[in-house]
Amino acid sequence: MFTRIFTKEEADALLPELRRVLKEMRQAKAELLLAQSRLPEARGVERRALEEEIRFLMGTLEADARYLASLGVLLKDLDRGLVDFPARVGGEIVFLCWQEGELEVTHYHPLSGGFAERRPLEEAATPPPKVAHPGETRPGA
């Protein structure tokens, strides 16, 4: 299903590279949008140059996206800097979820969920509270 399953430490170690690639991708996207906005009025040599620039920038973005995929991560939203890492938390396959600006990976969400279902990793490490059933005595009671 996934080419790689990350630990939190492995995901954290990739963050400097992800920051670098996301910055390059955003720059290429901004240049692409500018070139596309100038295209309708361009004629002749200028139009051909813009078309070539657009092809180049699209190729750059596609190559960067393939590179991220080759690392085993999923780019969810370039503008927000959202990246998911397949991982195992509590025996379950989930996505570690990182948003650019965060210093480290601190959240995860189920495979079927997204950013809105993010939960702190520390919650996964904390066992659920034990509930006393009728007739049971609790320690210290």
Predicted regions and their residues:
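Charged/polar positions within long, soluble alpha-helices
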Residues: 30, 37, 66-69, 73, ...
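Short amphipathic alpha-helical coiled-coil/interface segments
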Residues: 50-65
